[in-house]
Amino acid sequence: MYTLTPAAAGRSRRKVIFLGLRGIPEVQGGVETHVAALAVRIAARDWQVEVLGRKPYLPSPEPYVWKGVTVTPVWTPRSKSFEALLHTALGLLVAARRKPDLVHIHAIGPALLTPLARLLGLRVVVTHHGFDYDRQKWGDLAKSVLRAGERMGMSFAHARIGVSKGIVDSVRLRFGVAASFIPNGVETDLPKFGTSYLDYIDVAPRRYVLCVGRIVEEKRQLDLISAFARLNDPDVKLIIVGTADHKGGYLHAVEAAAAATPGVVMTGFQTGEALAQLYQHAGLFVLPSSHEGMPMVLLEALSHGTRCLASDIDANLALDLGADSYYPLGDVAALAAAMRMKLATPDSAADREARAARVMASFGWSPIVDRTIEVYESALVAWKAGGAHRGGTGLKKHLEIGGH
């Protein structure tokens, strides 16, 4: 029977380093939102937590502490093609000097370097956030690299996490390794927010459709703008929140379509209370994506009790919102009709409270943190046992949360 290895000399608490994301806090992205919430809560469980962020995205060029989490900027070029891999490589060299108990790599692109982490003597957990090679923005070479990253991460990590059951099942089937289903979480006990930001952008509560996300091809904002134009309702606006990390043709196309369509407001990236106000007072939230892992923005909208409409991709269907909350991906006419129907249906305070209660019961952070720490402990046991490739003895137990 194996026991956990002692914490590194000179440390009274275990330490985990997060790697593979742009950074925290208030950095655009589902992985970034996930890690920001998770890292703070793990730090509150008496772990030392450090996030190695990408210097161009962080508010300070020097290390800082945010809510008990140390955030360390690591240089990387701001490049669509190379920044994630180069930053991960440099981050692993930093981590090797830090000698943490664990490195937690997020996403399959950065996971390509899991074998390097092993060669550096690091114990590794990898979270699979989605099949990124299905994203429209990537060419054939990038997709091949992402598939290789998935294979390396799943094969060489000491323990693996998938944010959806579909990911976990796929990993088990294709790679023959154990993985634990731990979904994204939502904040509970949200306060009632005012409307100061709504007043600032001149929109009225319940009289707008909201879309939140990075402006990239697979988020399909152009579909939503086209569908909104078909509503032809001057009393309703469309609010698009988000921006692109790298300027390009799709961003310009969305900006042009928004400018040409009356009632469309682009706010850029928002966070904090401004974003919370937009979620809480929306008449309808729409997620028209062609690709998601576990749709964080959809969970956030639901946690505020907001009505939702989403494309019928597997990741969205897994949330089981009801048949009237989905439409066929890419069908602009069907999206417009579904939006019209949703907006015409009364939505009471009781309806919104029930919606929020359901998602909070299934996706609250406390059990997610519990399960993540269990996976960390199993990874340490696997390292001690030398059984990392097949998951080690500590991965025999797979408690599944998420309400399904």
PLM features: what roles do these ranges have?
Residues 324-333, 341-347:
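Conserved acidic donor-binding segment of nucleotide-sugar-dependent glycosyltransferases
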Residues 290:
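Aromatic "clamp/platform" in nucleotide-sugar-dependent glycosyltransferases that forms part
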Residues 55-57, 186, 212, 237-252, ...:
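Glycosyltransferase donor-sugar binding loop
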Residues 17-19, 198, 202-230, 239:
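Conserved donor-binding/catalytic core segment of Leloir-type glycosyltransferases
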Residues 303, 307-310:
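Short hydrophobic beta-strand element within catalytic cores of glycosyltransferases
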Residues 93, 119, 143-160, 254:
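Membrane-proximal helix-turn-helix segments that form the acceptor-binding/catalytic region
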Residues 269-270, 277-282:
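Short alpha-helical donor nucleotide-sugar binding micro-motif in glycosyltransferases
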Residues 251-273:
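Nucleotide-activated donor-binding/catalytic signature segment of Leloir-type glycosyltransferases, i.e.
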